[in-house]
Amino acid sequence: MKIFQEGMAKQFLSVFLSHITAVLLLAAFMFTFVAAVMNKPTVYAAVSVLMSLMYFFGLYSKGNELARRDKLSYTTTSVYLFKGAVLSLPVIVWNFVLWLLYIFAWNFLTLDGQLFSFTGIFYNILYVLNTFMFSGLTTIEGGYVEWYAHLFIYIVPIAALTIGYIAGMYDFSIFEKLAPYIYEKKKK
């Protein structure tokens, strides 16, 4: 069985676009709500946990969807146990490249400890926006990233897509299991 199969390019793009969509939707949430709680560390951490879970389940859903699609007889891709981890590569590479640009900006585009060029400011905003859902749980500011922030930034996409993909392989959906408890039954 080949790790990289024909047709996976579209799946990689789909996963990457799901990551970008999740970041943008959570950013809209952040700018309307999080700004009010940033000075309250406990509330800010709780909001970060909530946003991290929303991000996790967004990627989980994508992994689940791709596994269910791979099981169809007419697709060019096949299922295998850790394909979800392989499908997380675009997100991992994107996060790593943004981290390198962030480090570059803070090491080479600063003047007296402040970013002074449009490029440096752009790299900073891009990285902080891409990782903000974890910002209440760790320190990501001023060119400094806590070591455990990388655990969140890299492990969450791998775990979400892998767990979602494995669940999709076995036709398990956490949303279907929780639906009876979430929706009210109509009375006849």
Question: What kind of region is each of these model predictions?
Answer:
Residues 1-66:
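Transmembrane alpha-helical insertion/packing segments
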Residues 5-20, 77-94, 144-149:
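Loop-to-transmembrane boundary segments
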Residues 27-39, 100-111, 139-140:
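Juxtamembrane "helix-exit" motif on the non-cytosolic side of transmembrane helices
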Residues 56-87, 100:
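Membrane-helix interface/capping segments
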Residues 58-62, 146-177:
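Transmembrane alpha-helical segments in integral membrane proteins
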Residues 83-122:
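Hydrophobic alpha-helical membrane-insertion segments
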Residues 121-160:
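Hydrophobic alpha-helical transmembrane segments
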Residues 172-188:
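Short, highly charged, low-complexity non-transmembrane loops/tails of multi-pass membrane proteins
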